[in-house]
């Protein structure tokens, strides 16, 4: 009886993962795609199922070409993603067209899904984190990490790091003038100061500089970094002003050193 169960399970699994011989699944990413974010998530899911994908850069919005498994076709339907089943012959014609020197496009073969980390505070903020909202909707798995994980060398566990609303200079986004009495701002300052003390730093700016350096080392080691919003500027400013006190008293308790601007090395 047990042997029959195993045979049945194997048969069902083979049906689910049945390869559509000589066929491919084309996922357009131009205006014909009705659910772009879900399409990215579907491609990630396909990679996690040990299926390779071809990313057709600069072709119809960066479309995807996947192996023609019935399970992938089923997922496309479940996630309401626009797709086409095309023959291997048509897929090869597409590859040949993109490979022409006169065509400004490229094919990148994707083999494994990246392990993603999002650098974001664990506590609630008065704005939405666009990165986590997008990844959650797309059904792309990720971990939320912050200063503790970065300083404890856990960045090495990931392939891709996202930065969103963050001020690596220790000025809390320069919200002091407008929100210094807001409870969320006070709590943010208290938590940052507590974190700095925990890791032996006298100032939050020193803590954030240490985090920025760890992120720099992560990218030098081959890690991918995607920064947006205030993270793009403040990350560079923090690294460029190492050892320079350009923060006023409301941010670190003391004044600005003499002529800090002339000492910053971009």
Give the predicted meaning of each segment.
Residues 25, 30-34, 64-65, 69-74, ...:
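Helical hinge/lid and interdomain linker segments adjacent to catalytic or ligand-binding clefts
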Residues 53-59, 145-148, 248-252:
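Surface-exposed patches in mature extracellular/periplasmic domains of secreted proteins
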Residues 47-51, 120, 165, 222-223, ...:
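Sec/Tat-exported extracytoplasmic proteins
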Residues 228-266:
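An acidic, glycine-rich "communication" segment
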